[in-house]
Amino acid sequence: MQLMDLRKQGIDIQENIPLSRFTFTKTGGPAQYLAFPKNLNELELLVDTVKENNIPLTVIGNASNLIIRDGGISGLVLILTKMDTIVANKDEATVTADAGARIIDTSEAACEAGLSGLEFAAGIPGSVGGAVFMNAGAYGGETEFVIKSVRVLTRAGEFKTYTHDEMEFGYRHSLVQETGDIVVSATFGLEPGDKWAIKAKMEYFNGLRRAKQPLEYPSCGSVFKRPAGHFVGPMIIKAGLQGKRIGGAEDSMKHAGFIVNVGGATATDYLDLIHLIQKTIKKDFGIDLQTEVRIIGKEKD
């Protein structure tokens, strides 16, 4: 079966779509093919079809901590945001969420059920799949602290469930970065708590985020991993790069660890500024800054 034949089965597949429509930076080149599976059956059909036809496959979530190069992505890009069911089980103190569900919404569902543990995620704009993939965290919380199990679809087309320990979580790392498995859902193991205390903690974290982060501009969130014993923002400030602009990409005056799109930025602008910061920090401090943001796609011809 050819990929475009799946349209006849009601699967939403589009061609040559600018991915800048979906990324939080508002940058990125086109996807050769773009699909939005609505359920596991559609996802499985898409994965089987690209495997059968040797078509490259890229999976993205909410595209919040992601830079897609200006040349775009060859093959099929899957965006899983239509797979967004969230089920809270108060008796078992768990929340199970599809990969395309927003982690913010998952945190709110836990709160409504009086379950504590996901408060840290109240302002993280990514998807559940992305949070698992990156082991997203904030304000002392990490995804790995609350993961009970993760269900995936392997590139071979088989469904599999990993336990917490099998996920090999590390700082902004998980097993699926190595295997290429597609996260389809995650179950979070939480603790019973007072709904209003949980909500107050979430609102406190959101207040910190609004005060410290440049939410008024498009951005990809935190750009760099934190090196042991150092903070990225102060190093960038000491290096004289806060406020530095290349094209429409600017190192934020509100938080130097963020790069914002102040108007008309391209992915190349972002990457050129990232490389300048890395080069300068290496020269001034002897530290190799690693990117936290996921960078994919091809350069523009």
Curated annotation (Swiss-Prot):
Flavoprotein is among the record's keywords: yes
Matching InterPro entries: FAD-bd_PCMH, FAD-bd_PCMH-like_sf, FAD-bd_PCMH_sub1, FAD-bd_PCMH_sub2, MurB, MurB_C, MurB_C_sf, Oxid_FAD_bind_N
Domain called FAD-binding PCMH-type: residue spans: 26-193
Superkingdom in the source lineage: Bacteria
Pathway(s) served: Cell wall biogenesis; peptidoglycan biosynthesis
GO cellular component: cytosol
GO molecular function list: FAD binding; UDP-N-acetylmuramate dehydrogenase activity
Gene Ontology biological process: cell division; cell wall organization; peptidoglycan biosynthetic process; regulation of cell shape
Active site (record annotation): R172, S222 (proton donor), E292
Record field: catalytic activity: UDP-N-acetyl-alpha-D-muramate + NADP(+) = UDP-N-acetyl-3-O-(1-carboxyvinyl)-alpha-D-glucosamine + NADPH + H(+)
EC nos: 1.3.1.98
SUPFAM superfamilies on file: FAD-binding/transporter-associated domain-like (SSF56176), Uridine diphospho-N-Acetylenolpyruvylglucosamine reductase, MurB, C-terminal domain (SSF56194)
Reported cofactor(s): FAD
Localization per record: Cytoplasm
Pfam families, per the entry: FAD_binding_4 (PF01565), MurB_C (PF02873)
Family that this chain belongs to: Belongs to the MurB family.
The protein's name in its UniProt record: UDP-N-acetylenolpyruvoylglucosamine reductase
